[in-house]
């Protein structure tokens, strides 16, 4: 539904193919209006990419060293909404209720991310976008499963918060996330990587 930019002070600029994050108090909005009607015409590819960007925001906020209880609750709510409503939205793109739920999920994850900043998945995403043309949300979510696996091993307590939001345990968090991504046909959005014929 969006990138969460309506509720944070972050932006991106491109310079000769390089992508940079910028931040400033003047980028923070004074008023936010969420109108799901504006999302009804979004194509499936953009719907999926922005939703996975929001999901990445929520995951990264939870395992972020700057996390706090409020961030946790916002992120949990966002994860639950995305898990439930993204598949429904893909099948019923003009359904206003589903669009509203996805927009709210993006908004909540955006607030969480604005308090913690992003983490490794976003950092890795930049070259994936600049070198191979992956859309931002697809690039961010490409490494979610692997980073989840690392967090389960090294910080199981934080990982369990994500697992509970996904309706699973730490033991099957990676497979649960993979199943969710397969359900929304995630592989179909990886064509730029496949075309690049990357072997390692």
Give short role names for the model-derived ranges.
Residues 74-125:
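Oxyanion-binding "anion nests"
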Residues 1-69, 158-161:
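A glycine/threonine-rich phosphate-anchoring loop and its flanking beta-alpha core
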Residues 28, 46-53, 69-80, 118, ...:
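Alpha-helix N-cap/helix-start motif at coil-to-helix transitions, marked by capping-box chemistry
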Residues 41-42, 110-114, 127-134:
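A short glycine/serine-rich beta->alpha loop
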Residues 130-198:
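Gly/Pro-rich interdomain helix-loop hinge
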Residues 5-8, 49, 53, 57, ...:
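Residues on a specific face of well-ordered alpha-helices
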Residues 57-64, 80, 84-88, 107-108, ...:
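Short glycine/serine- and small hydrophobic-enriched flexible loop segments
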